[in-house]
Amino acid sequence: MIKRSVKFFSLLTFLFLNQFLQSKENNIYCFIGDAGEVNPTQSLVVDALTNSECSIVWHLGDITQLGVKSINDTELQESFLNPFKPFLDTNVPFYLTVGNHDHKGNPKVYMEVAKQYPSIHHPNNFYTKRFGDLCFFVLDTTIFDKLYYFHKRGSQIRWLKDKVKEYKDDCEFSIAVAHHPLFSSGDRDRANPQLAIFLERHIFGTFDIYITGHNHVLADEGDHKKTRQLISATGALPGGSPIETEPGKFNVELPGYLKIIVEGNSARYEFIGAEKREILWSNIKIGNGLR
């Protein structure tokens, strides 16, 4: 009887550990940005994602170069849906963020796209997504970058404050996802004053990691107010790395993507080159949830 109990317990332990390990293996988040122009680089990055171990992918904005005005806009098919078809066919969940080029059209079109493509997620231009105690906040930073969108800012700020307060005790690790960075070690300038004020007040010092596109590089810019800024924006038009990278930072203009694995309050991340599928840079961030 004791032997049977031991065997049964061992079987349960094996099944539990096996499921635990599988969940950890599947907990791989990847990030690309600025992949809206049809060219060989875009194809290279899409192919790398299609054949990657990513279980969830986030697009960091500038989904197309010209923006799309409706669900029937040819730009949508030609610059996004057709080039990304090999990846979309994998049914890997694909979460969208909108950038400044998407605002050249109507970025809410992607809400309609998400209804037609089960693997695409875009419930709004700003939203949250939780995976257990890992919390993602997706933001629309273009409305802070462009003065003529000032009337749209209040609703997002109020929403953000409410959600941070609501989730504060539930998030062991927090990631904010948006299009525009606050600063850069490359040739892009710091965010303009109105955008910088928003990011300084509401993002840096609140989240563990802030992941963006816009600057067409792969970059680990280090911490500011204990928030790590990462950039993954070489989906189609790499360019803008410094001649010499500052010590402790990483900044290259190679096609690729960012890969993150989060366990508890620890995130291990790697920048992957699309051409050779090699690790270009890796690092670790210990988080504090939402502050």
Task: Label each residue range with its predicted role.
Residues 1-9:
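Bacterial N-terminal signal peptides that target proteins for export
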Residues 69-174, 189-209, 215-263, 267:
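Extended active-site neighborhood of metal-dependent phosphoesterases/phosphodiesterases
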Residues 249-291:
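A short C-terminal boundary segment appended to hydrolase-like catalytic domains
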Residues 29-31, 57-59, 96, 176, ...:
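Residue-level marker for buried hydrophobic side chains located in beta-strands
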Residues 20-75, 184-185:
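N-terminal active-site segment of His-dependent metallophosphoesterases
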Residues 11-21:
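Hydrophobic h-region of N-terminal signal peptides that target proteins for export
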